[in-house]
Amino acid sequence: MPADSLEMTLCGKKGRNQVNNYKINAINAFGKTDVGLMRTINQDSIFVSTKPVGKLPNLFIVADGMGGHKAGDVASRVAIEKFVKYACTTHMTDPANILDAGIMSINKEIYDMANSNRDYSGMGTTFVAAVIAEGHVYIANVGDSRLYYIGKDIQQITRDHSLVEDMVRMGLLEKEEARTHYKKNVITKAIGVAEDKTATPDIFEIEIDNGDKLLLCSDGLTNMVIDYDINKIIRKSESIEDAVRTLINTANENGGKDNISAILISAEYTENQDSLLSEK
């Protein structure tokens, strides 16, 4: 599916889930996904909405699908569609609870889908999502797609659910060695691959300072561009859109071995942010 073509209905309102650039209530966000240079199908999907999605004031998602010729594409797209539907219909109001329960719900749906259709057998997807509310960021992740906080420096907030990350934590591998390790693509958690709690997401809550940024991305970016260069590109770029496009171009220039997805968010607060949100 072309990167700019997919439209979804957000609680009765249409929104695009591949490339978006909005400025609403001092939250700027731009996202883009690219097939890369070595793949013929883009199995990544992204979702960007600075508008409310159900009880959530905004929502940003990167999903990196896997499994079979078409199944990875289906898994990432359906995961986002199902999560948005869940967010639109749940009666819960706490962002962390919505992220946690929503991911567990879509895990079962995708698992059942994979087991009822031979073409989708073995499919699954990573999932990293973020919601900004009242100066806090609520984050959930399953797999090795990441969220970075860019303030005074760049900081990886999420922890990869991967074999090499476990090896780094056990002291068996250096962090830089993990980037090029032959098992770097082996993940230990994914949505849709099992019915049990192996898809339970990590949930984080952090504060975000005025003007700081968040980056959600798939491993197609981080395997090709080191954190230092990601930080440098974001700081030197004239806009968040320019930064995202440069990040993707750099990943392709460095080999483009996988699909590449990135969402960059900038939060700028005003005194009347809550009242502005209620007027929309």
What are these regions (language model features)?
Residues 2-280:
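PP2C/PPM-type serine/threonine phosphatase catalytic domain
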